[in-house]
Amino acid sequence: RSFPPEIGGMQNLMGGLANALLNHGPVKVFADKFEGSDVYDQSLKLEIERFGGIKLLRKYRKANRLNDFIKSNQNIRSIFFDHWKSIEKINDKVIEKIPTFCLIHSKEINHPLGSSLNKRVINSFKKIKFIIANSNFTKKLGIEIGLPKEKIYVIHPGCEEPIEVEKEYELKAEKIYQDSFPKIITVARLDRRKNHQNILMCIRNLKEIFPKIKYVSVGDGE
């Protein structure tokens, strides 16, 4: 569901994970088509199979293809899923002997207990051996909505190795921050659900302790 060149936090995380796993052997990726994905895929050492078309049909086609692929490849060492919906249509018998992992973050599992979506989430995760939460907050939420505590592990999202910053951007950053302290930056869409308003309230309170604090938010939105 989430993979570059589409822009987003989960996309970056899954792209980074796939590339990092190349250090341990060949990696096969099943992902949705996206504008520019053909060119992007050619630049990588990953074997990537893309799926286009209507979203609902794509979900079934991808699951059927993955089920067939697993059945015909007995040397699969592990499988990583980015979302519970990616697991939902997978045959549990096909993956029962394979170490399986699925990432969770609060938004996609936060459904009322006993609701239809909550039941779908729980049934999907029954097929998975390891549930990877991006924070202790998400782990706690997972337990509250009915996921088994013993399956959930917290691994904070990683990042790429630092790149060399071009002088042009270094000067731009210096102009923005000047002599401010502390310097804080976030990269996120400016959506209300991301609670930027609460961060701004915190910054306002911190300004009494750190009068030169500067907070920069980078992202599209309203």
Predicted regions and their residues:
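N-terminal strand-loop element at the rim of the active site
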Residues: 1-7, 13-58, 221
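A short, histidine- and acid-enriched strand-loop-helix "catalytic/donor-clamping" loop
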Residues: 6, 57, 87-88, 100-116, ...
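Acidic anion/phosphate-binding donor-loop and adjacent secondary structure
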Residues: 112-113, 143, 158-175
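Conserved donor-binding/catalytic core segment of Leloir-type glycosyltransferases
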Residues: 176-194, 200-203, 216
